[in-house]
């Protein structure tokens, strides 16, 4: 009877480990696919454009509610959040055309893309910038991925405590791992855009 109990317990542990590995493998495949695209020499121009617009979207969405009017926006927070990443002009009520969040996002995206295009124009050969983008993006992905692996390992070591709180450790690992992965990809975007 004791042996059966121990075997069942060990089976449960192995099953959980397989689930943890499945989460890690899914994330690994996504990152390796991104790395492959960079290493295959694809132009990263469209990727960087998307990163720029996504960064504007996320920062504005995080700070402005859909129902807030221009007079309710926290301009200091918007500037503090966005300008260290994308050096757009100081964001003030007078400078913003329109009164809606979507109009602000559109204006800031246009400004950010113009800044990128101005940087692009500084290079006599656009392929030089493409190569720099590939090298930089690869370094950022690799560094952030290594940090993420360490963080996921720490999460796995501490996740067993969730069982004491009557939570399924596998579900908690998946949810926390997903949040951490999203945070890592956001961080990759922001650092690349800078």
Predicted regions and their residues:
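Extended, charged helical/alpha-beta scaffold domains that provide interaction surfaces
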Residues: 1-194
């Amino acid at each position: 009877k004791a042996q059966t109990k121990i075997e069942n317990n060990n089976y449960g542990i192995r099953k959980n480990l397989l689930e943890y590995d499945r989460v890690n493998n899914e994330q690994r495949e996504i990152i390796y696919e991104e790395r492959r695209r960079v290493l295959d020499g694809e132009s990263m121009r469209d990727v960087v454009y998307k990163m720029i617009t996504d960064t504007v979207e996320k920062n504005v969405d995080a700070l402005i509610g859909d129902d807030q009017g221009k007079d309710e926006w926290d301009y200091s927070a918007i500037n503090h959040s966005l300008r260290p990443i994308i050096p757009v002009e100081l964001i003030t009520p007078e400078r913003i055309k329109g009164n809606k969040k979507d109009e602000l996002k559109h204006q800031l995206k246009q400004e950010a893309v113009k800044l990128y295009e101005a940087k692009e124009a500084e290079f006599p050969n656009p392929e030089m910038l493409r190569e720099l983008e590939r090298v930089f993006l690869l370094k950022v992905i690799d560094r952030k991925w290594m940090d993420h692996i360490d963080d996921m390992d720490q999460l796995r070591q501490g996740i067993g405590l969730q069982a004491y709180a009557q939570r399924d450790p596998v579900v908690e690992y998946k949810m926390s791992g997903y949040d951490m992965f999203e945070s890592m990809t956001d961080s990759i975007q922001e650092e690349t855009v800078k």
